[in-house]
């Protein structure tokens, strides 16, 4: 071990090391969720994977750091590991998205079930475990370097843990509310990599302490001569040993100085390169027609357009969340099917109709209803104000349509107004929020409907089986609240529109209102909906005790929407890649390259 550096004489620096290490761990964890979300969603399942892999890395780092500190208690090695962690974190914005795409490609062809889970887990292990393993070595190492008296060891360890915890708290809030919304995920990684790098550089630029040989105490020269000679002989021998050790230490310091200079130089070079090459916030780097790509507090956001349409996506790999037809015609998507709800509520018989949309998105449904119906008053609720901004800018959402920045359920709790139609179209990435899928929520919706009012729910993940998956669970839950339920599948998509009301005659009301519809395009669409509408009869339990009870009703206490959604996503992915799997089985890599025209 080389000599002690002056900076270590002050425990404040060691406490700050613990502080910034704790802060960086949490910042990387939150950055991980934002890096993975555009590809795998930000569901509770993905969060569980992120937290689990990070805890594994930290535990292994704690074990290794403690053993390494006992075996060779050299602070140079600890701060060298911090430099290595900083380098790795700085490279995440540069290569992370390519690693995710590569892992996803491999998993698609090698995993038949739970694709998102396995792909997200593999991506976390490859990208995040190593730097967090290194940061996990910090705490046990610092305990070794800061505890110099067992009498106050508890106080010292307590201070270290306090600084780590405070750093973790700050590392939780700063990325979420400051850096990610302001500068994006990529630069957030670079900021915290830079902090770790600067912390280590300060250490390595600190000089070593000087240890002088001192002088003889007064009176030592008055000792008796014989004893003095003996002492002098021993002194000469010890002096020789000291000189030998000093020479050895000087050589070690020289060797370490060269190694440390190389570490610092490598860290600075990689960090500078990463700052120039990793600043891009583009997750869909292969897309060429994007008019906007960015991040909000809640979502990854991507807007692209072609000659006919404008699209919004909150996920790189799966689906489109909103579509706007530039020519003003119907989209052919679920919005058109959902326009049956105003007819069911008697839009042609009323002077005006009040509509609430929970999950406004870019406002396609609101825009269409305003365009095709007279006297309709639409209000929207959208939790992500950046999506509302994009809706006004790119999707021509009228300024006359109010949009409230609120959680859908919280909004219903806060208002007393009632509506003729309530559209429920709220999603967190590709899964419905659990708090908007329970019997308690749908009961709340019913309480905000006028007599004869209609709720329409957009279900975006219709599976192959009619009696399992998220759409089945939602249908069972809704039918436990509303006595009249109808459903219709959206042609060519995995969407299903589900209509519910206390009015048993909504089909008759719809038919009567369609008689006065003059728009041929809309009338043709409503005829298609009418022909494909099916009454939904809930499945009930059979047997003792629970006979007659509706099965599978989701509650606030138990609403496994993520797991149910994952089952359907597996089916959708299997359908999408089956064609390419067949090509791979028959023609291998060459066949795939030819299929993609490489």
Residue ranges and their predicted role:
Residues 369:
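Aromatic pocket-lining residues of Rossmann-like dinucleotide-binding sites
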Residues 388:
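Short alpha-helix immediately C-terminal to the canonical SAM-binding loop
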Residues 338, 431-433, 464-469, 507-510:
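Extracytoplasmic/secreted cell-surface and envelope-processing proteins
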Residues 258-322, 327-328, 334, 340-346, ...:
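Soluble small-group transferase modules, centered on the S-adenosyl donor enzyme superfamily
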Residues 411:
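Short acidic active-site motifs
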Residues 400-402:
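Short, conserved active-site loop motifs that form the nucleotide-linked donor/cofactor pocket
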Residues 1-293, 305-307, 318-320, 343-353, ...:
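Alpha-helical transmembrane segments of multi-pass membrane proteins
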């Amino acid at each position: 071990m080389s000599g002690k550096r002056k900076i270590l004489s002050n425990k404040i620096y060691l406490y700050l090391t613990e502080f910034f290490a704790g802060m960086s761990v949490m910042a990387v964890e939150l950055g991980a969720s934002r890096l993975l979300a555009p590809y795998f969603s930000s569901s509770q399942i993905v969060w569980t994977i992120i937290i689990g892999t990070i805890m594994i890395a930290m535990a292994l780092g704690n074990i290794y750091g403690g053993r390494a500190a006992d075996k060779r208690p050299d602070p140079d090695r600890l701060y060298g590991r911090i430099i290595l962690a900083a380098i790795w974190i700085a490279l995440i914005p540069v290569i992370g998205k390519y690693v995710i795409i590569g892992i996803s490609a491999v998993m698609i062809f090698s995993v038949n079930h739970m694709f998102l889970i396995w792909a997200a887990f593999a991506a976390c292990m490859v990208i995040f475990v190593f730097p967090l393993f290194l940061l996990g070595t910090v705490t046990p190492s610092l305990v070794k370097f800061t505890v110099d008296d067992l009498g106050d060891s508890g106080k010292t360890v307590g201070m270290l843990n306090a600084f780590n915890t405070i750093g973790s708290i700050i590392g939780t809030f700063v990325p979420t509310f400051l850096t990610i919304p302001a500068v994006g995920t990529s630069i957030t990684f670079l900021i915290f990599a830079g902090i770790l790098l600067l912390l280590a550089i300060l250490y390595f630029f600190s000089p070593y302490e000087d240890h002088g040989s001192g002088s003889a105490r007064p009176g030592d020269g008055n000792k008796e001569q014989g004893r003095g000679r003996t002492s002098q002989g021993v002194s000469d021998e010890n002096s020789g040993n000291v000189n030998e050790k000093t020479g050895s230490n000087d050589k070690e310091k020289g060797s370490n100085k060269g190694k440390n200079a190389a570490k610092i130089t490598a860290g600075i070079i990689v960090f500078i390169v990463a700052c120039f090459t990793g600043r891009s916030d583009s997750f869909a780097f292969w897309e060429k027609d994007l008019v906007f790509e960015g991040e909000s507090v809640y979502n990854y956001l991507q807007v692209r357009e072609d000659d006919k349409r404008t699209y919004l996506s909150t996920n790189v790999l799966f689906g489109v969340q909103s579509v706007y037809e530039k020519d003003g015609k119907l989209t052919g998507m679920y919005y058109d099917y959902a326009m049956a709800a105003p007819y069911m509520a008697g839009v042609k018989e009323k002077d005006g109709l009040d509509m609430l949309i929970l999950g406004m998105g870019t406002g396609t449904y609101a825009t269409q209803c305003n365009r095709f119906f007279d006297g309709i008053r639409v209000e929207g609720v959208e939790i992500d104000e950046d999506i509302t901004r994009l809706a006004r800018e790119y999707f021509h959402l009228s300024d006359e349509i109010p949009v409230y920045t609120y959680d859908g359920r919280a909004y219903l709790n806060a208002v007393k107004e009632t509506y003729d139609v309530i559209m429920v179209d709220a999603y967190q990435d590709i899964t419905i929020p659990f708090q908007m899928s329970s019997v308690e929520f749908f009961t709340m919706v019913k309480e905000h409907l006028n007599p004869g009012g209609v709720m329409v729910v957009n279900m975006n993940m219709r599976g192959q089986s009619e009696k399992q998956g998220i759409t089945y669970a939602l249908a069972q839950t809704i039918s436990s609240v509303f006595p009249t339920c109808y459903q219709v599948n959206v042609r060519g998509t995995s969407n299903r529109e589900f209509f519910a009301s206390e009015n048993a005659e909504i089909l008759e009301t719809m038919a009567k209102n369609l008689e006065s519809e003059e728009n041929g395009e809309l009338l043709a669409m409503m005829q298609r909906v009418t022909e494909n509408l099916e009454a939904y009869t809930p499945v009930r339990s059979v047997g003792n005790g629970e006979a007659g009870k509706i099965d599978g009703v989701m509650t606030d206490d138990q609403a496994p929407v993520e797991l149910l959604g994952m089952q359907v996503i597996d089916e959708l992915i299997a359908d999408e890649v089956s064609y390419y799997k067949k090509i791979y089985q028959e023609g291998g890599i060459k066949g795939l390259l030819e299929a993609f025209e490489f």
